[in-house]
Design a protein with these regions (language model features):
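S-adenosyl-L-methionine-dependent methyltransferase catalytic module, highlighting the catalytic core
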Residues: 17-25, 35-160
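A short acidic, Gly/Pro-enriched loop at the edge of an enzyme's catalytic core
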Residues: 1-7
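Short catalytic micro-motifs in class I SAM-dependent methyltransferases
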Residues: 10-15
């Protein structure tokens, strides 16, 4: 069994069905002084449902569309002309969604502690994709959980084993 000084998990955890098992395994693989870097889009952010992957311009550019309750989300996707396969993929992301609160619980449950956590209003990888400069979430939005959850486009988190 090899232990790792650094493990990077970027934009992955929101696609994993068994998130507690993943986090527990990552904690097992982490060296005692090792660092786990996790980046994830909080579920309630404007495109937390990954609907930007939709084919229709409406669905791909409609912020918070994924937050429609129950059957309204797949109905809206069908109405926009999405294929059954695309809808199934987007609903799968809804099933594996991750919020800031859920991520913190998963980390603690795996015996990990947060070293640092940074929230971004403009995700750093949007610079390469869209030419937008990264911007941290303003402190006022960061300290109010519901505002943070709706406006943070990504969270960068460094974790270590609890001592």
């Amino acid at each position: 069994n090899h232990l790792y000084d650094l493990i990077i998990l970027r934009d992955v955890i929101e696609h994993v069905e068994d998130q507690p098992r993943l986090m527990a395994r990552l904690a097992e693989l982490l060296a005692p002084d090792g660092v786990l870097f996790v980046a994830y889009p909080p579920w309630r952010m404007p495109f937390g449902g990954h609907q930007q992957m939709a084919v229709s311009r409406f669905a791909a550019h409609c912020p918070w569309l994924h937050l429609l309750p129950g059957p309204l989300y797949p109905w809206a996707l069908r109405l926009a002309g999405e294929t059954p396969g695309k809808i199934a993929g987007l609903l799968e992301i809804r099933d594996t969604r991750i919020s800031v609160r859920k991520f913190r619980r998963l980390a603690a449950g795996a015996g990990l502690r947060t070293v640092t956590e940074r929230f971004f209003l403009i995700n750093p990888h949007y610079e390469a994709k869209f030419g937008l400069k990264p911007r941290c979430l303003p402190r006022l939005l960061e300290v109010v959980p519901w505002l943070r959850d709706f406006f943070a486009t990504t969270c960068f988190c460094l974790l270590q084993r609890q001592e």
